[in-house]
UniProtKB/Swiss-Prot annotation:
PTM annotation (Phosphoserine): residues: 269, 281, 332
Residues recorded as bearing Phosphothreonine in the entry: 277, 324
Changes after translation: Upon binding to PCNA, the N-terminal UBL (ubiquitin-like) propeptide is cleaved at Gly-77 by an unidentified deubiquitinating enzyme; the resulting mature SDE2 is degraded by the DCX(DTL) complex in a cell cycle- and DNA damage dependent manner. Both SDE2-UBL and the mature SDE2 are polyubiquitinated.
Residue numbers spanned by region Disordered: 175-252, 264-372
Prodomain residues: 1-77
Swiss-Prot/TrEMBL site (Cleavage) positions: 77-78
PANTHER family, sorted: SPLICING FACTOR SF3A-RELATED (PTHR12786), SPLICING REGULATOR SDE2 (PTHR12786:SF1)
Positions in coiled-coil regions: 109-149
Stated name of the protein: Splicing regulator SDE2
Compositional bias annotation for Polar residues: 270-279
Organism: Mus musculus (Mouse)
Biological role stated in the UniProt entry: Inhibits translesion DNA synthesis by preventing monoubiquitination of PCNA, this is necessary to counteract damage due to ultraviolet light-induced replication stress. SDE2 is cleaved following PCNA binding, and its complete degradation is necessary to allow S-phase progression following DNA damage.
Length: 448
C-alpha cells in the first residue's frame, strides 16, 4: 500500500496559515521552513520555529498535521535593566506612600484619595456653617450682656470714707493757715511802712528826671529808670537791705561824665562839644578820675547792680574837687603825647570811646585811610593810563601789584602775570563798571 503524504501547517510571518505537503516521510523541518520562506520572500535567518510553544530543532522530522509557527528573532539590548528593577523593588518595600501607585482600573491612588476627601468635606460644609453661626451668636450675646461685677469689701469702703474725711479736714486747715498768714503780713506791712515826706518825693522825682550823656549806655538809662521806680514802690526795709543801689547809679553817672570829659579834652574828638556842654551842668557830681576811658570800660563791662558799695565810697573820698581840673589837664597832655608817639589820630581815639553802634563805622573810615596810606609810606599811586599793556605792569613786582589791587578792593592773589592782567583790565574804569567777579570777598569773622 502506498505511503500517505505528510502535511504540515505553517503560521507566519504575521497571521498567514498555510498547509505545506511534504514529498517524503523523512522530510525535515528545515526543508519545510526554507520552502515557505522562499514563497513569502523573507530570510530564513530572521525566524526560529516553535511547535505548540516549544522550540523545535531544525533537523527534526516533520509531524503530520502539526502546526509550526515562525517567530521573528528580537535583537538583544545592552543589559543592566535588571539592576534598576531590583533598586525600584527595594524602594517600594521601604516606603509607605502608595499614592503614586495605580489601582486595577489604572487610576492613581492619589487622585482616588483626593476625591474621597473632597466628598467628605462637601458633606461637612453644612455642619461647619452651623457651627460658625453658633459661635457668632454666642460672641454677640457676650458683648450685649451686662457686666456682672459684684465687688463687696467693707475694709475698702471704710478706707475710702476715712480718706475723704481726712482730705476735707486738711483743706480746711490749710485755708485757715493761709488766711491767718495773709492777715499777719498786712499788719506788719502797715507797721513798717511810714509815710513818705514831701522832700523824699521831690528827691525821687529829681532822680527820675536826671539824665546823663551816656556813650553806648542806652540800656543803663532804662535800667536806672526801672530801678528808681521799683525803689519808690518797695518798703524801707528792703531799701535798708540794699543800701548801695542809689550810690551805684551815682557812681555810674560820674564815671560816664569823667570819660566824656577826657574824650572832649583830646584834639579832633567828634563829641567834644556835646560832652563839654554837659560837663558844665550844675547837677554834675564830683568823683575821682582814674586812667583815661576807665569809667567807660567799667560801665560797659558791668551793670549798675554789680558795683560794690566799697568802690563807690572810695571814689567819693579819695580826691577832692579842687584836684580834678589839674589832673584832667595832666592826663589830656599825656594822652596827646601818646598819640604823637603811636601815630594815632584824634578821630581814631574818639572812635575807641564810641559805643558799639559808632564802632561799626570805624573800620570803613580806616579802610579809606588805608587807601591813601601808600602815599604816607612813600609809595605813589600808580597811573594805569601810563601803561599800554599788562606786560609793562609786571615791572612793578608782586608786592606793588598786590598793594594796588588791595587799594581798589580787587583780588590780590595769583602769579605776577595774573595780577598784572587783573590790574590792567580795570584801567580807566569806575567802580560800578568793574566786573563784580574781580572784587575780593569780605572776610568772615572768626567763629567762637
Amino acid at each position: 500500500m502506498a505511503e500517505a503524504a505528510v502535511v504540515a501547517w505553517v503560521r507566519g510571518p504575521g497571521t498567514v496559515w498555510k498547509a505545506l505537503p511534504c514529498a517524503s516521510v523523512g522530510c525535515s523541518v528545515r526543508d519545510v521552513i526554507y520552502r515557505h520562506c522562499q514563497e513569502q520572500e523573507v530570510p530564513v535567518e530572521c525566524f526560529f520555529v516553535t511547535c505548540n510553544g516549544v522550540l523545535v530543532n531544525a533537523g527534526d522530522k516533520v509531524q503530520h498535521g502539526a502546526v509550526y509557527s515562525l517567530e521573528p528573532r528580537l535583537r538583544g539590548g545592552k543589559g543592566g535593566f535588571g539592576s534598576m528593577l531590583r533598586a525600584l523593588g527595594a524602594q517600594i518595600e521601604k516606603t509607605t506612600n502608595r499614592e503614586a501607585c495605580r489601582d486595577l482600573s489604572g487610576r492613581r491612588l492619589r487622585d482616588v484619595n483626593h476625591e474621597k476627601a473632597m466628598a467628605e468635606w462637601v458633606k461637612q460644609q453644612a455642619e461647619r456653617e452651623a457651627e460658625k453661626e453658633q459661635r457668632r451668636l454666642e460672641r454677640l450675646q457676650r458683648k450685649l450682656a451686662e457686666p456682672a461685677h459684684c465687688f463687696t469689701s467693707p475694709d475698702y469702703q471704710r478706707q475710702c470714707h476715712e480718706m475723704a474725711e481726712r482730705l476735707e479736714d486738711s483743706v480746711l486747715k490749710g485755708m485757715q493757715a493761709a488766711s491767718s498768714k495773709m492777715v499777719s503780713a498786712e499788719i506788719t506791712e502797715t507797721r513798717k511802712r511810714p509815710n513818705k515826706s514831701k522832700t523824699d518825693q521831690e528827691t525821687s522825682a529829681k532822680k527820675r528826671k536826671r539824665k546823663c550823656f551816656w556813650l553806648g549806655m542806652d540800656g543803663l538809662e532804662a535800667a536806672e529808670g526801672s530801678s528808681t521806680g521799683s525803689s519808690e514802690d518797695s518798703s524801707e526795709d528792703d531799701s535798708e537791705d540794699a543800701p548801695g543801689t542809689s550810690e551805684q547809679s551815682c557812681c555810674a553817672r560820674e564815671d560816664g561824665i569823667d570819660a566824656v570829659e577826657v574824650a572832649a579834652d583830646r584834639p579832633g574828638s567828634p563829641r567834644s562839644s556835646a560832652s563839654g556842654t554837659h560837663s558844665e551842668s550844675p547837677e554834675k557830681l564830683q568823683c575821682p578820675v582814674t586812667e583815661p576811658g576807665q569809667g567807660i570800660l567799667e560801665n560797659t563791662g558791668t551793670e549798675p547792680g554789680e558795683t560794690s558799695d566799697k568802690e563807690c565810697n572810695e571814689r567819693k573820698t579819695v580826691t577832692d574837687p579842687e584836684e580834678t581840673p589839674a589832673r584832667k589837664e595832666t592826663e589830656s597832655h599825656e594822652a596827646t603825647e601818646k598819640d604823637q608817639k603811636t601815630g594815632m589820630s584824634g578821630g581814631d581815639r574818639a572812635a575807641m570811646v564810641l559805643s558799639g553802634e559808632d564802632r561799626k563805622s570805624v573800620p570803613a573810615a580806616n579802610l579809606e585811610g588805608n587807601n591813601s596810606g601808600d602815599t604816607a609810606l612813600g609809595l605813589e599811586a600808580v597811573d594805569l593810563s601810563a601803561f599800554s599793556s599788562a606786560a609793562e605792569l609786571e615791572s612793578l613786582g608782586l608786592e606793588r601789584l598786590k598793594c594796588e589791587l588791595m587799594v581798589l578792593g580787587l583780588k590780590c592773589g595769583g602769579t605776577l602775570q595774573e595780577r598784572a592782567a587783573r590790574l590792567f583790565s580795570v584801567r580807566g574804569l569806575t567802580k560800578e563798571l568793574i566786573d563784580p567777579a574781580l572784587f575780593a570777598k569780605p572776610s568772615k569773622g572768626k567763629k567762637k
